[in-house]
């Protein structure tokens, strides 16, 4: 009686020719008599106590040891008698003290708006104006506000951030981006001898704030954290006149139907409706001046698009201004007698975006009436490229180490925003 089929015998015999003694790896024909299954065995059924009305299950709870033919008992949760943070279990959402039936749509530093600036303008009821205001541009062109050897100092700041302050051959963006901004701010502080009122300011790192408002039956909130914030003892002067503010009533906000205006916002039912400037009462520098937002992600998928960064600047400046306005004038929705002005600078260490935001009204529910104003100057290159290593071809240095395509007018705008309100 044959123990194997013809193809199986040929496969086993052929393996001996390879020096495997007849017990080597079989050929494909060895599996012609069947198909090997890849399915895993079913897991054993769970030992559960089935609740049958009128019957009491018999378990091994009283035996104090495992009995295979008895049902497994279900013990109540063990109470330690004290709260151990290692084994904390959060309560159900509907039992949380801050739970609310109405959802709140929150914008925070990790949000990326799909429609960018257009979506931010609709959420904040704002009219966009391209370019910086004339009051700021006058500070840019005034030679009295320039620093001695200004271009050379800025080039040293760039080289320090990208070359001198690190031991890496090519430093990462998360390393050099904060250093460039901090050094540029320190360079602007050198003007304190010309403008003594600069001593009435302070720069705070990683400040937080929150502001809540209603927009067409939607409850919105912005929470800011990260970056640097320049605060002052005196508020920034108003940019637009009363006539320009009244003229915004005729402006029509751009919509992006069928896309929802709350797309990419974080929907949450556990929140606290509050307006917080981030500082306690009696803080000596209560007024926001400039927010510095950094896009310092190393990986390209984690970086913000330029339009998304500008939208983040608008919403954070709006939230800071709204929290300050609610603190000064209360929670009633109305047109402000004295508008609140907040500036913002966004950068990735190479490209800068400048914003001046003026909050004219806290009546944000409907599209009619006075609008807020935002002046945006975008995509301003500080330098085109930085060579961390020299480019050598045929033993000749083609590109030396250092920045390429330096744009001195970008720092002049950076300095003008810093001096705004003091010069």
Swiss-Prot record:
Keywords: Mitochondrion, Ribonucleoprotein, Ribosomal protein, Transit peptide. Pfam families: PDCD9 (PF07147). GO terms for biological process: mitochondrial translation; translation. It comes from the Eukaryota. Component of the mitochondrial large ribosomal subunit (mt-LSU). Mature mammalian 55S mitochondrial ribosomes consist of a small (28S) and a large (39S) subunit. The 28S small subunit contains a 12S ribosomal RNA (12S mt-rRNA) and 30 different proteins. The 39S large subunit contains a 16S rRNA (16S mt-rRNA), a copy of mitochondrial valine transfer RNA (mt-tRNA(Val)), which plays an integral structural role, and 52 different proteins. mL37 forms a heterodimer with mL65. Belongs to the mitochondrion-specific ribosomal protein mL37 family. This is Large ribosomal subunit protein mL37. It comes from Homo sapiens.
